[in-house]
A protein has these predicted regions:
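Alpha-helical scaffold within the catalytic cores of cyclic-nucleotide enzymes
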Residues: 108-109, 140-158
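Conserved nucleotide-binding and Mg2+-coordinating catalytic segments in signaling enzymes
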Residues: 47-69, 83-97, 105
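A short glycine-enriched loop-to-beta-strand structural element that forms part of the catalytic core
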Residues: 132-134, 160-180
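Short loop/turn elements at sensory-signaling interfaces that couple input to output
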Residues: 8-33
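Per-ARNT-Sim (PAS) sensory domains and their PAS-associated C-terminal
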Residues: 1-7, 16-19, 161-163
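Short helix/loop segment flanking the catalytic signature motif in cyclic-nucleotide metabolism enzymes
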Residues: 103, 130-147
Length: 180
């Protein structure tokens, strides 16, 4: 089979009350895939769409859809932790939603400083994050969670000097079982 890329456009319409679908098929060539400067237009666009699909727009970490599509059925040895921002509703109610957003961004920044590039941070919603650290030893995993808690406690929320962050963290080790 050829390694070609095709664009297919389908249009529904009716002729004398009979439903029909017209399909237009177009084979994409290098002019459609690569611009004059040699950039890969289609692949760059697809990568951008994938990032929009799987990234939380506020924090930039993976989102719940990424978890559902890629992580929950993953079967491996990993440290898995749920991280929940304490008093998040209070920050939003007392200081406003911008303060809550800044608190979430601060937490993500603190977590990223403590983990490897192969580890995954997923914002499940609101102030809940899932952390997946594949192939980590349990002793190191426990130390990482303590390091994260300490780093978050010491973090400053830009523009909101009175906010003192703390998180609740629960962690388990998976042994050849799904993350879910």
């Amino acid at each position: 089979m050829e390694n070609n890329i095709y664009q297919i456009i389908a249009k529904y319409f009716e002729i004398d009350g009979v439903p029909c679908v017209m399909e237009m098929i177009h084979r994409l060539d290098n002019e459609n895939l690569i611009d004059n400067d040699g950039r890969r237009i289609l692949m760059d666009n697809l990568t951008g769409y994938k990032n929009e699909l799987y990234r939380d727009p506020l924090t930039g970490v993976y989102n719940r859809r990424y978890y559902e599509d890629n992580i929950k059925d993953l079967n491996e040895n990993a440290g898995v932790a749920m991280i929940d921002l304490d008093d998040f509703k209070l920050y939003n109610d007392f200081y406003g939603h911008n303060a809550g957003d800044m608190a979430l961004e601060t937490i993500v920044s603190a977590i990223k400083k403590c983990i490897r590039s192969s580890d995954k941070i997923i914002r499940l919603g609101g102030d809940e994050f899932l952390l997946v650290l594949p192939g980590i030893h349990s002793n190191i995993f426990n130390k990482k969670l303590q390091q994260i808690r300490t780093r978050i406690k010491e973090a400053k929320v830009d523009g909101y000097s009175k906010i003192r962050l703390s998180v609740s963290i629960g962690g388990v080790m998976t042994h050849n079982e799904t993350i879910e």
